[in-house]
């Protein structure tokens, strides 16, 4: 299950135009603008350490909100959950989150046992007024 948590984080961070072949913006009004994303190695390789770094600018203060994550392997739903943005496990940021620049780096290994195939994800982030801050659709093949 830890792999799927990391995959969810990967889906959130893969929002740079350099990864335009695997992600698309599904929201009309992005209040969180990604300024850079890097992933090493690119593409990710099972059994190898992956480093993902991302930074962006939050355009409004957040006092609360949610992250909704849907991850599928083919037709099989792996993750379908909503998390409180203020208490995300492993996040260094706690509410209130002030507008401004943010960056974060994660390191993890995709297990060798992860099945090959097509993974899809949908991530939607909303603020304290249930307004969408960011929305991303991702397709990744291992």
UniProtKB/Swiss-Prot annotation:
Q: Which GO terms describe its molecular function?
A: sterol binding
Q: Which UniProt keywords apply?
A: Lipid transport, Signal, Transport
Keyword Transport annotated: yes
> Which residues belong to the signal peptide in this entry?
1-20
Which SUPFAM superfamilies does the record associate with it? E set domains (SSF81296)
Gene3D superfamilies referenced in this protein's UniProt entry, alphabetically: 2.60.40.770
What GO terms in the biological process aspect are recorded for it?
Answer: sterol transport
Give the SMART domains listed for this entry.
ML (SM00737)
- Which Pfam families is this protein grouped with? E1_DerP2_DerF2 (PF02221)
Asked if the record carries the keyword Signal, the reply is yes
UniProt-listed InterPro entries: Ig_E-set (IPR014756), ML_dom (IPR003172), NPC2-like (IPR039670)
Similarity section: Belongs to the NPC2 family.
Its biological purpose is as follows: Catalyzes the intermembrane transfer of phosphatidylglycerol and phosphatidylinositol.
The entry describes its oligomerization and partners as: Monomer.
Q: What is the official name of this protein in its record? A: Putative phosphatidylglycerol/phosphatidylinositol transfer protein 2
Q: Which organism is it from?
A: Dictyostelium discoideum
